[in-house]
């Protein structure tokens, strides 16, 4: 049986200039008919979130589950999404409900290379240092303590607003867990350097 006969097909929810990494929980405002059509066509409450930068779709998306449908404070529709895991995108079709694509779901290995553990420890330390500089150390420590898998730990970089969208896209597209941790760690180190510089500037002018 060919991949096209077995691969699940999910509606695409385009993310313009945004990236949602696996493990993230987000509330998504539904702002146009394209988004509404994708959500309404969800298969068993599942869709695939695909970054769209400068009009081009990324080759990797994130399978997500719709866990809530609500009205936002401004009266518009919103949905609560739980991002589950990566997916390579296959052939697509444009139909009445919008864009539907075959997905090859990518699950992180349960036993990544030993190097991943060392990178994960360093990643935790850098993120914790940033959080403590911002007076948010306890909450972030509790959050990180609940994440055991190195690949999922790297994906927490998606929550950092200072990390550029293009960098988050590279993290999304990095399937290998060790390489992904390196990419996420480099991004967090740059974030730490920026936060440290801003802190020194504030201290100098105070």
What are these regions (language model features)?
Residues 1-206:
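N-terminal low-complexity, acidic/polar interaction/targeting segments
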